[in-house]
Regions:
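Short aromatic-glycine-enriched beta-strand elements
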Residues: 12-16
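Canonical P-loop GTPase G-domain recognition
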Residues: 116-168
Length: 294
């Protein structure tokens, strides 16, 4: 048996990199195929090498972490990538992605691209919200190169993935960090205000002692498989004010004495973050109702 890491999976084939950097194309057995997310990019596996036929993955080793969207495992970091403009920044989408990362137990940072399209005040209006919430925020421009060195230094030696909506410049950022690492880039559609998908699957690419992954973009993101009762845990700044809640647990919605709601009123928690929290709660409720009707 040989050990390795899945660096790409596409059309039922799994490309496994061994410790000596050999890439072996593998399949998985039928029983594994029946389990959703049984093997994903980033998984450490053991496989039976067959030089005369298909090599077969036999075992998926224990995961450090797993994220469903993008579908990857064993990440050190996820870079939540958004544009400041073209397409416009979406607080709700950013907050969903950060909540998903918190749920998965993966370190997340926010990377704001296209800073050359906005003023300093506009940039700080976005970045300040997330720095206040306790996140590291990188501000970059692939047009003029601003901020790329700081991001590159942070990513050195890590297994990281870039995730975000279509058209925000994920592939362009990767190409700026290491020329040629991600070749396809696309423009934002003027009609729909979103990017055209150019990355079709997640692939780990060697980068400065670690790996970087570009991942497929998206136009929308559903809050599936999140328990409404657990959502507050995924807004990291809430915990700093929960001591002011009269009821435990507190949903931070209708309760008369709530430290989180007070913090929002006092400007200690950004109103946009709290609005995203309420919107995601409503979405979870709606998804649950629709599921119950099936």
């Amino acid at each position: 048996m040989t050990a390795g890491r899945i660096i790409k999976n596409f059309n039922g084939y799994y490309y496994v990199e061994t410790p000596d950097k050999e890439i072996v194309t593998c399949k998985i057995k039928g029983k594994m195929k029946q389990v959703r997310f049984s093997a994903v990019t980033g998984d450490m596996v053991e496989f039976e090498k067959n030089p005369d036929g298909e090599s077969m993955i036999k075992t998926i080793l224990s995961r450090r972490n797993f994220m469903e969207r993008p579908t990857m495992a064993n990440l050190d970091c996820i870079v939540i990538a958004f544009a400041c403009a073209d397409p416009d920044f979406s607080c709700l989408l950013a907050d969903k992605m950060l909540a998903f990362a918190e749920r998965a137990g993966i370190e997340a940072v926010l990377c704001l691209n296209k800073t050359d399209l906005v003023s300093e005040a506009q940039l700080e209006e976005i970045a300040g919200v997330y720095r206040k919430a306790g996140y590291t925020v990188f501000t970059v421009s692939t047009f003029n190169g601003t901020g790329l060195e700081a991001l590159k230094e942070y990513l050195n030696g890590k297994i990281s993935a870039f995730a975000g909506p279509s058209g925000v410049g994920k592939s362009s950022m990767l190409n700026a960090l290491q020329p040629g690492i991600a070749l396809q880039t696309g423009k934002v559609s003027e009609k729909i205000g979103r990017g055209r998908h150019t990355t079709r699957y997640a692939q780990l690419l060697p980068f400065n002692g670690g790996y970087l992954a570009d991942t497929p973009g998206f136009g929308n993101l559903l809050a599936e498989n999140i328990d409404a009762r657990e959502l507050y845990k995924y807004f990291r700044e809430f915990k700093n004010f929960e001591h002011g809640c009269k009821f435990v647990p507190c949903t931070h919605t209708h309760e008369p004495v709530c430290g989180v709601k007070n913090a929002v009123e006092e400007g200690k928690i950004a109103a946009s973050r709290y609005e995203s929290y309420l919107a995601i709660l409503d979405e979870i409720k709606l998804l649950k109702e629709k599921s119950g009707k099936r």
